[in-house]
């Protein structure tokens, strides 16, 4: 059975950037890495309803700069900036260095892999049929301008006795093309029957000359579906 490399990891330094940017010697590397994991877990827990896609962490000159990519910046910032200021104070205490927080809004959440995976998982937890949830997400992404999208769900789908995997795809998802800008994300849906895994691949175009091809809305391609 063929195994696939992580679509983001293989493209780091080509069309994808690292989410943690800092340098550490051998003594501090593990501490920095552990601190990053704790910061991300803390923010994901605090901002569950804020549609957070990605958290970037940089450590320039004895400070920390955290960039939160979210589709709902108002929830992160709070009334008159109270919520984001409290986050900054908590993170400064946790990391032990001054923290600066930047908020970046995601203009098209339908084209963000993590937000699409979260949306599908939330629908599965509300007992929406998995085929309907996948089809709706695929249609929305293609309507906004994705070149291709694939969604896969695995587990006890519909409460079945035996776990299985099903997927739905439209357009192209060229995993072997390194210049292809593919957004990949995974998420878990916790249902009464157990955990259902959700994987999303979104092909946004090829990066040529340092910029991605302009995304244009297009008509949906013929449906392609299969199951294992």
UniProtKB/Swiss-Prot annotation:
Repressor found in the keyword field: no
Gene name in the database record: rpsC
HAMAP family: Ribosomal_uS3_B
GO CC terms of this entry: cytosolic small ribosomal subunit
Top-level taxonomy: Bacteria, Pseudomonadati, Pseudomonadota, Gammaproteobacteria, Pseudomonadales
Its job: Binds the lower part of the 30S subunit head. Binds mRNA in the 70S ribosome, positioning it for translation.
Classification via NCBIfam families: rpsC_bact
Subunit structure: Part of the 30S ribosomal subunit. Forms a tight complex with proteins S10 and S14.
Endpoints of the signal sequence: none
GO function terms (MF aspect): mRNA binding; rRNA binding; structural constituent of ribosome
Occurrences of domain KH type-2 (ranges): 39-107
Record's protein name: Small ribosomal subunit protein uS3
